[in-house]
Amino acid sequence: MTAIEIKYELYRNTARNGDIILWKSNSLASDLIRYFDNFYINADDEKIKSPSYYTHISYVHWHRNRLENCDAWYEGITNVPMSHRIKHYVDFCVIRPTKINLVEHGINEGLNEWEAQVKYDYFRLLRIAIVKKTGIDITGLSNSKKYICSLFIQKYCENIGLKSYEFCKLMTPQDFIRFANRSIYKEEVEILLNDN
């Protein structure tokens, strides 16, 4: 068994509906994301150096006895067993919402997007890369009816009532760690299995 498979087996025993999963990969696409996502702007508009470790994000839900992973993948919104998704990654961590009263609503909204076959927004990736490196936002470069993984999960967080992430226009997966439990929204989430 690989390290991620062992970690998955440990996590699966404690996984909860609505957990958010951050993924690390060593692919070329992930290397490019890390190149562009090496800082963030804090609430005081200060540029903070913060190298990116995680480059993909999803949420999980139980369907019968299977832990499924819902995310915006290169083919659009997908819903696959988490055991399939780990084959593409080398590490992951969990962001667990502490308030669960709206989790089922958020899960169902995401599954509705999957059933509607919402496509992936490749141009939004380019838009974020340009903003991260130049500070220039080309707003017409993305499609509001398509998703990338971080926008899909930001919408999920909105649907379950999390406030920590609503201020950021163009989030990356790593931003979900950077902005978890901002001081004004203490204890909205807990971070688990983060070996980074």
Residue ranges and their predicted role:
Residues 1-6:
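Short, structured beta-strand/loop micro-motifs enriched in basic residues and often containing a Trp
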Residues 131-196:
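Activation targets extended, charge/polar-rich intrinsically disordered C-terminal tails
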Residues 51, 100-104, 146, 150:
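Solvent-exposed, acidic/flexible segments
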